[in-house]
Amino acid sequence: MNKEEWLKKGYVTEPVDKTLDLKTEIDKLRKEKNALILGHYYQSGEIQDIADFVGDSLALAQWAAKTDADIIVMCGVHFMGETAKILCPDKKVLVPDLNAGCSLADSCPADEFAKFVKEHPDHTVISYVNTTAAVKAVTDVVVTSTNAKQIVESFPEDEKIIFGPDRNLGNYINSITGRNMSVSYTHLRAH
């Protein structure tokens, strides 16, 4: 199978020798390549068992930022790998399954979001961390669900704000802060 076929599938589907001890082989490569394996809470137990650290997307990004490993293997979705690369531009970041997507990030096409932002030049743009690097590139502040309220409240009450792409989180922050942020058209379909 050539590289293009692998990329099309998103992962390697070649049969693995049943006599191979995968954990031992992964540990060997981890040491040999100076790699850090990060696993999201949503991963299977087998993936979590071999990960150096298991956590949510924010915790994984924080681990990536402080590692001295040469390679970061992000067992999560695309935006998590992109976030690790933003924080660690000199490191090689690998996402084992190229089909691993996030419905929220996928529901916010960067070109459409950038157009929306351009149509509102007097607005501050706040984006939820679960979004692509391309959306983050047109964002002023990136927030998590834990700090979104605090960040929004740090702006003057009359500040015009676009909040995206999680409409549910944006609407909740509007309701508890009394703000009237422009909440983008996207939302989390299934998580």
Residue ranges and their predicted role:
Residues V143, N147-K149:
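Donor nucleotide-activated moiety binding/catalytic core segment of transferases
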Residues N2-T83, L87, P96-D111, K115-I126, ...:
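Metallocofactor- and cofactor-centric catalytic cores in central/energy metabolism, strongly enriched
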Residues I151-F155, E159-S175:
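Internal active-site segments that recognize and position negatively charged phosphoryl groups
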